[in-house]
Amino acid sequence: KARGRIAESINANDDEIFFTSGGTESNNWVLKGVAFAAKKEDKNKNHIITTKIEHKSILNSCKWLEDNAGFTTTYLDVDKDGFVNPEDVRKAITSKTILVSIIHGNNEVGTIQDIEAIGKICKESKVLFHTDVCQSYSKSELDVKKQNIDLMTLNAHKIHGPKGIGALYVKRDTRIMDWQQGGSHEKGMRSGTENVHGIVGFGEAVKIAKNDFKKNNKYISELRDKLIKGIMENVENVKLNGPDIKENGNKRLSNNVNFSFSAIEGESLGGYLDQKWVCSSTGSACNARTLEPSYVLKAMGLTDEEANGSLRLTLSKFNTEEEIDYVIKILPKIVEKLRYISPIGKVVNYFKKDKKE
């Protein structure tokens, strides 16, 4: 039943859904499974196309294939809002290309790519197209047939399901090697005892998300827009990272807010917010322990200072308008305090002239 619900949610067939431990495993399986299947058939087929702002599980899998199996990768640039130009995909495809892998909704800045246009280009070029929809699942309309998608990565916990369970959609007749050898689990493609309780929870989460899709996204988008507007109006020298909500609100994930604050570090800002019971992040959850500037923001053209001053706030249907008001109330005071004690803030003088130092 869970397999059927997931398949129905993306307009796929039940037998095209394979359960995994999550998005990272699904992404690894796609890259390596497609790569080795292609190489087995034709040794000259060794080229992969992706972008500079993909999830680490894609970028690191590409690097592994480069270092250990003789594959090459083209990493496409993105614009200042994180969009990849579909025509850049077309230009990058060669006779050796086996796969194009582009994330649908970016996990840091919320940019939603035009996967339908990219999928059409891949279909015309007879190249497999994979997209990671972990962030956009339940927040955007997905249709593997309409959007010409051959492989799709999904997971449960981003839609309030259990952790440790994900899925991979593989279009019928797509050449991909089995991921684990052993028994006959998952039609012999991914051996190992299935996470039954996780699968059931995944299916239930899909059911709930489908029933409340429009209502939840409208509500969360309104919270997002209020938070963005409130911060922009009450904090000086702040930059919204990702698509502008006025021009491209429908091309930004409904739950994503990402700002860069001049003259302070996002890490410090996040620490103060944590003391006020506000959860935040300075980048992707998978990269949160590193002190390096976000590679996603750097790829979008931000300076090290701008990237280090970034803060991400992620919303859900469980957030309230009162919580948004609370963040808008406390954040400006925290930013002002951090700028006051920051050496950078003193040098560039971000304070109004009539304020006392």
Model-derived segments and their meaning:
Residues 1-357:
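Pyridoxal 5′-phosphate
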